[in-house]
Amino acid sequence: MKIGVFDSGVGGFSVLKSLLKAQLFDEIIYYGDSARVPYGTKDPTTIKQFGLEALDFFKPHQIKLLIVACNTASALALEEMQKHSKIPVVGVIEPSILAIKRQVKDKNAPILVLGTKATIQSNAYDNALKQQGYLNVSHLATSLFVPLIEESILEGELLETCMRYYFTPLEILPEVVILGCTHFPLIAQKIEGYFMEHFALSTPPLLIHSGDAIVEYLQQNYALKKNACAFPKVEFHASGDVVWLEKQAKEWLKL
């Protein structure tokens, strides 16, 4: 089965990595809109337009399913993309919410949503969590993580300063942290380590990873089986420098 994966840049690699590990598909077309990253600082109308343009990009590739591996686009453009598509278009928010529903039984557990400014302002996660009965939800726009990750700054003083800036003011320590941007799993270990060290936690918070969540969602909703395709083919495209994107993919995905 041939599918597409769409993201604003390299953040979708976290989803792609999970898909490749699960071996669900034999061919994956990855499109990163790297010329216009980040999406998280742009207005909803612009993001919807970017989503529709991504649909146009994938049409000649004759894919059977499109994964929107971008939380901002999933929050603001998914519905519009689904209206204009003849194939299934799947976002990353619903799978993440269902993963929480499976793993977090305490409806009063403190949940922290990390995301871009646009994702947080959309209230997509907050509303979906409240519909599932979760009452103790807070959110934090951590948009500065995106350009750092796009520049491959995955550790060191800059990232530490950024985490300190965002996390020091937290008044309630979360038991669950939603990595509400597909860039963020690329620094998940650093986020977990920061919480453990600076808040003296005995156990780390549960991190909800879009990539892992969407693999389980696809298996349940599209009758897909793990390890069905041992050697999936991956093809990379970008609105910006595709050579740079491929280089990042080789480094991060070990292709």
UniProtKB/Swiss-Prot annotation:
One GO MF term attached to the UniProt entry: glutamate racemase activity
Biological process (GO), any one: cell wall organization
Pathway(s) it belongs to: Cell wall biogenesis; peptidoglycan biosynthesis
Claim: Ribonucleoprotein is one of the keywords in the record: no
Active site residues of this protein: 70 (proton donor/acceptor), 181 (proton donor/acceptor)
Matches recorded under InterPro entries: Asp/Glu/hydantoin_racemase, Asp/Glu_race, Asp/Glu_racemase_AS_1, Asp/Glu_racemase_AS_2, Glu_race
Protein origin, superkingdom: Bacteria
Residues that coordinate or bind substrate: 7-8, 39-40, 71-72, 182-183
Keywords: Cell shape, Cell wall biogenesis/degradation, Isomerase, Peptidoglycan synthesis
SUPFAM superfamilies the UniProt entry points to: Aspartate/glutamate racemase
Catalytic activities: L-glutamate = D-glutamate
Stored Gene3D superfamilies: 3.40.50.1860
Keyword Magnesium among record annotations: no
Enzyme Commission designation: 5.1.1.3
Function in brief: Provides the (R)-glutamate required for cell wall biosynthesis.
Family per similarity comment: Belongs to the aspartate/glutamate racemases family.
NCBIfam families in alphabetical order: glut_race (TIGR00067)
Record-given protein name: Glutamate racemase
Source organism: Helicobacter pylori (strain ATCC 700392 / 26695)
